[in-house]
A protein has these predicted regions:
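Acetyl-CoA-dependent GNAT
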Residues: 4-94, 99-100, 112-114, 118, ...
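Short, conserved glycine- and acidic-residue-centered signature motifs
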Residues: 86, 108, 163
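Flexible, glycine- and charge-enriched loops at secondary-structure boundaries
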Residues: 12, 105, 163
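Conserved glycine-rich acetyl-CoA-binding loop
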Residues: 75-77, 90, 99-113, 120-122, ...
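C-terminal "cap" of GNAT-fold acetyltransferases
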Residues: 2-6, 125, 132-174
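Short beta->alpha linker loops
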Residues: 14, 130-133
């Protein structure tokens, strides 16, 4: 396969601004999907979910976290991250998203593989993640590396904004 993209870690004061457009695209897609599924105009009318979503970016950039992007030429076409959790052995994978125009090229798998390797290097022994129930392709990707369904976990983003019932929770030992 001819790979025309690369995975790189972001850090520093400008990292959040670099990924903000892709994070915005991902959040807008999720919220639009929920609104359509529920027949609602908005599922986040007061912006609670949006504020929580963007506040997490600093946890990806802090100690024990990681923020990766996939670039095709100079365009960021994918993103993935992990953050530390309530215990020192567990990381939570977050914000795995590949733009529709770049899907099917192996970017999501490359991002996930790098996140898992980096989490191991940080000393984590397991990763957890939450994904919306409608994201069946994501479920298949995570299950292909051995992730298994678990009960909802404390501190989950979806649980904190009332979407636990529309979320699949997964865990993978490293």
């Amino acid at each position: 396969m001819n790979v025309s993209w690369r995975i790189e870690a972001l850090s520093g004061p400008d990292a959040a601004a670099v990924v903000e457009p892709l994070f915005r695209e991902y959040l807008d897609w999720i919220l639009a999907r929920f609104a359509a599924d529920l027949g609602a105009e908005s599922v986040d009318p007061d912006g609670t979910a949006e504020r929580a979503y963007f506040a997490e970016t600093q946890r990806f950039l802090g100690p024990g976290g990681r923020l990766l992007v996939a670039r095709r030429d100079d365009e960021i076409v994918g993103v993935g991250a992990f953050k530390p959790t309530y215990d020192e052995r567990t990381a939570e994978i977050k914000r795995m998203f590949v733009r529709p125009s770049a899907r099917g090229s192996g970017i999501a798998r490359a991002l996930l593989d790098r996140l898992l390797n980096d989490a191991r290097s940080e000393g984590y022994t397991r990763v957890r993640l939450e994904t919306m129930s409608f994201m069946t392709e994501a479920h298949a990707l995570y299950q292909s590396v051995g992730a298994r369904a678990i009960d909802p976990f404390d501190g989950s983003e979806a649980g904190n904004v009332g979407l636990a019932g529309a979320t699949t929770y997964l865990e993978l030992p490293l």
